[in-house]
Amino acid sequence: MSAQVSLELHLRISQFLFHEASLLDDWKFRDWLAQLDEEIRYTMRTTVNAQTRDRRKGVQPPTTWIFNDTKDQLERRIARLETGMAWAEEPPSRTRHLISNCQISETDIPNVFAVRVNYLLYQAQKERDETFYVGTRFDKVRRLEDDNWRLLERDIVLDQAVITSHNLSVLF
């Protein structure tokens, strides 16, 4: 296991993640994009249910990408949301990103830190459409020379194997 970080560094990285979540909840997508590293990897795979005997053998069923985005692709997703023509987001969703169990450790790369958080993402739209997404995120954050932070990687793992939402237009 990699070395854990100091309490001060843990607080700084946690505050960066909380700020990033509030930008998404407030629909400040351009400000959120500014928090992303140019080399961002933003991924989510399908979740599959593996049999216990297969998991014991280390056998994992194949999965499919839901997201495998670069910064350019994320910019295009946001540009589409801004047009008012993204019908899945008319009227716009109200979201709340809750982050907990934040575990942060050093990596082999200087100024890059591995972060594991549990999340609950609540999405409400129209009068009765509500969706909860629950899972774990594996992030990598980079500390810049000016002591600011950038999100370098985000791997989103959903606990649910079946997504019951009408769309998957939210950002995690």
Swiss-Prot record:
<comment type="subunit">
    <text>This dioxygenase system consists of four proteins: the two subunits of the hydroxylase component (HcaE and HcaF), a ferredoxin (HcaC) and a ferredoxin reductase (HcaD).</text>
</comment>
<dbReference type="InterPro" id="IPR054881">
    <property type="entry name" value="3PPDioc_HcaF"/>
</dbReference>
<dbReference type="InterPro" id="IPR000391">
    <property type="entry name" value="Rng_hydr_dOase-bsu"/>
</dbReference>
<comment type="function">
    <text>Part of the multicomponent 3-phenylpropionate dioxygenase. Converts 3-phenylpropionic acid (PP) and cinnamic acid (CI) into 3-phenylpropionate-dihydrodiol (PP-dihydrodiol) and cinnamic acid-dihydrodiol (CI-dihydrodiol), respectively.</text>
</comment>
<dbReference type="GO" id="GO:0019380">
    <property type="term" value="P:3-phenylpropionate catabolic process"/>
</dbReference>
<comment type="pathway">
    <text>Aromatic compound metabolism; 3-phenylpropanoate degradation.</text>
</comment>
<dbReference type="InterPro" id="IPR023712">
    <property type="entry name" value="HcaF"/>
</dbReference>
<dbReference type="GO" id="GO:0008695">
    <property type="term" value="F:3-phenylpropionate dioxygenase activity"/>
</dbReference>
<dbReference type="Pfam" id="PF00866">
    <property type="entry name" value="Ring_hydroxyl_B"/>
</dbReference>
<keyword id="KW-0223">Dioxygenase</keyword>
<keyword id="KW-0520">NAD</keyword>
<dbReference type="InterPro" id="IPR032710">
    <property type="entry name" value="NTF2-like_dom_sf"/>
</dbReference>
<keyword id="KW-0560">Oxidoreductase</keyword>
<comment type="similarity">
    <text>Belongs to the bacterial ring-hydroxylating dioxygenase beta subunit family.</text>
</comment>
<protein>
    <recommendedName>
        <fullName>3-phenylpropionate/cinnamic acid dioxygenase subunit beta</fullName>
        <ecNumber>1.14.12.19</ecNumber>
    </recommendedName>
</protein>
<keyword id="KW-0058">Aromatic hydrocarbons catabolism</keyword>
